[in-house]
Amino acid sequence: MSGMYSLPTIHTIGRRLILRAFAAGLLAALAGPPAVAGPETFAVGTASAGPGQRATGVLSVPAGSDAGLDIPVAVVRGTRSGPVLALVAGAHGTEYASIVAVEKLIETLDPAEMSGTVILVPLLNTASFEQKVPHVNPIDGKNMNRFYPGKADGTQTERALFAVTKQIVERCDYLVDFHGGDLDEDLRPYSYWLKTGNEKRDAVTRQMALAFGLDTIVIAADRPTDPGASRYLDATAATRGKFALTVEAGRAGTVAPEDVSALVNGTLSVMRLLKMLPGAPSPVEHPVWIESIETITSEQTGIFRPLVARGAYVAEGMKIGYVTDYGGRTVFEARAQKACVVLYVCAVPSMKKGDTIATVGVVAVSPP
């Protein structure tokens, strides 16, 4: 498509793997000692890098009740000691912009400019990517951001998430989980700030969300707190004492340059916040804070017709869209239960009973 990045295949990815001053004092006080310092090599799977090096490889998940999996991974190590930052994308293999953004970071991060270590996973759900299946891993039908911390003896999804938990989450200091609109989701960019109730930890992750620069931030105060049933990647990191952020950009199977740039530049800004790169971060100054989100689902099967676009502000009771039967008769109307902003809306006509029509957010009256 004109104006878009060309989308690399999984084989291409495998080959190519081969704000400001106020935040610095805050992070220095709270982050504690980095997970990695000194001249030793750092390895994740077959990717092993020493100071000033970049390495690519795979994190192999052995076969069990179903097929094994090789997860593409890269390690980029700076020339100076510092924290470990993990960047994970592709839990949903058709969220293409986020996959391409992390792959671009693998190519462009310069170890000579860096302090610390970056672990990069551009594509967790390779089967979803290759088969163009949204939302789930087609090998076992499971959502790869709903089964953390995984199981060593589970299905492919569970075994993969167990490996990510052990080999990446437990070895990093900071983590960013990359997502976006799936094939059927027309999404506006936004991020999730995990509000855990730990004031010191929440202050750091709030600064990370601001530094990333997306202008809409969802306050996620309801993430699981049990490390043994953490469900999401960001919650898995948080329940293990890490500083985690989730970001969303990209929509409906596209790889728009502005979405890729937002994810790449946001990552570089966070790295500056963490003193992993020189320079100052570029935080968003006046974000829209979302205090709660709601998923609106269809009560009927048929043809979906949206009436609002991503990012639209709608009043309580306003019609967001409707579903017709295959003869054109309206069988369901979707309305906003509160005044809200549309975070994403279904991008395709296909609709089954129980499918998501839209996810909307209620804007906070004042910043947290």
Tell me what each language-model feature is:
Residues S2-I18, V36-P368:
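Structured catalytic-domain cores with a bias toward divalent-metal coordination
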